[in-house]
C-alpha cells in the first residue's frame, strides 16, 4: 500500500509515477475525497469549539443558579452533529483505504520506462546455448513423455494444465527442490521454513494479490481462505503485525511449496508440458531488510537465484522489467529467463523483486531501530529460486541426446543417487 501521507502531500508525483506503469489513477476523485474529508474535520472542530463554549455557559448558569435547560439542549444537538461529522470522516477514510488497496506500487527511479515485456532491456547473459548439429531440438514435453511425464493420466485425474511425474522424473523433481534448498540454506544463509498451502484472505491482501487479482486464485468454498499462488504469501505473512529488532535484519527465508494458480487470461498459451500449470513446485526466497540497503539486497537476491542456474549449467539471461510490466506490488523487478532450445528463446524462470515498504504497510511489518527510536516499515523482497517444473523443462531440452536420453547437470548427480543420465523408460526395461 502506498504511504497515504506521501500521497496527500505529493498527489501529482504519485499520479506521474502511476502513469509510468500505465495505471489509470483518478487523481481528481482522490482529491475530491480528500476535500470532503477535510471539510468534515474542519466542521467537526468548529462544532467542538462551539460545544466547549456552550459547556462553559451551562456551567456558568448552574453556578449562578439560573435555568440551563436551553443551553443543555443546544449542547446535546452539537454533540449529535459532531458524532455525525466524525462518522462521515471515518467513512471517507475507509473509502480512501479501499481505494489504496487497488493502487499498485510506484516504480523505482531505476525501473526502465516502457509499456510491456517487449520494452524490457536485457541486463546480462550467462552461458552459451547449445548448438544442435545431429538432430533438431525437442520440446520438453516430448522428451519427458518417454521418461515419465504422463499428460494423459494427469488430464484423467484433474483436467488440463496438470502433470503426473513417474519414476526418474518424479525423482528429478524431488532432487531439484532438495538441491535448491541446500544451496540457499548452505551457501546463501537462508532459513528453511515449511508453511501451510492454505492462507486467509488477510494474508493475500498483505502481499497484494487481493483484492485486485481474486480471479487468479483458487478459493475454498465457504471460507475466506485460498490455496497459495506462491510461497511468497505465507512466508511474508509470517511476520504480519510484528515489530522486528533492527539487529534481526536482513532476515531471509526459503520455502519449497506447491503453488496453485487459475491462469485466468492465459487461454491457449503453453497448453502442453510444464511451463504453465495450475499446480507447480517452486522454491521461494523471501527477505526482510532495512530500507537503506534494500536495493543492494535486490542485487544479492538476484545473484542467488542466478547461482542455481549456473550450478545447473543452464544458459540464461537477466532482464529488467519496465514500469509497464512490473508486478502490482513491485517497485523494481529482474526476471531470469532460461534458454529453451526447442522454443528458440529465453523463458521466465524467476522474478526477483523489491517491494520496498508496499507489502510491509499492508501487512504491518515493522522494525525497531537500535537505540529505541520510532518503529519503521521493513522493506520486503522475494524471488523464485527457482520454479521447479520450468527448471526440469530446461534440463530436458538442454540435455537431451539423439536417443532420447537426457544428460543431467553434474550438480544433481549426488541427489539422483549417482545417476548421470536419464534413460527412456522402454530402453531401461
Swiss-Prot record:
Which pathway does the record list? Aminoacyl-tRNA biosynthesis; selenocysteinyl-tRNA(Sec) biosynthesis; L-seryl-tRNA(Sec) from L-serine and tRNA(Sec): step 1/1
GO BP: any one term: selenocysteine biosynthetic process
* Superkingdom to which the source organism belongs: Bacteria
The protein's annotated catalytic reaction(s) are: tRNA(Ser) + L-serine + ATP = L-seryl-tRNA(Ser) + AMP + diphosphate + H(+); tRNA(Sec) + L-serine + ATP = L-seryl-tRNA(Sec) + AMP + diphosphate + H(+)
Please state the span of the N-terminal signal peptide per the UniProt entry.
none
Q: Which GO terms describe its molecular function?
A: ATP binding; serine-tRNA ligase activity
What are the subcellular locations of this protein? Cytoplasm
PROSITE patterns xrefs: AA_TRNA_LIGASE_II
Pfam families (UniProt xref)? Seryl_tRNA_N, tRNA-synt_2b
Q: ATP-binding among the record's keywords?
A: yes
Q: Where does L-serine bind?
A: 230-232, 284, 384
The principal location of this protein is: cytoplasm
- For this protein, what is the EC number? 6.1.1.11
What Gene3D superfamilies does the record point to?
Answer: Bira Bifunctional Protein, Domain 2, Serine-tRNA synthetase, tRNA binding domain
Q: Where does ATP bind?
A: 261-263, 348-351
Q: Which GO terms describe its cellular component?
A: cytoplasm
Per the record, the domain comment is: Consists of two distinct domains, a catalytic core and a N-terminal extension that is involved in tRNA binding.
The similarity annotation says:
Belongs to the class-II aminoacyl-tRNA synthetase family. Type-1 seryl-tRNA synthetase subfamily.
Subunit text: Homodimer. The tRNA molecule binds across the dimer.
Protein name per the record: Serine--tRNA ligase
In the UniProt record, the gene name given for this protein reads serS
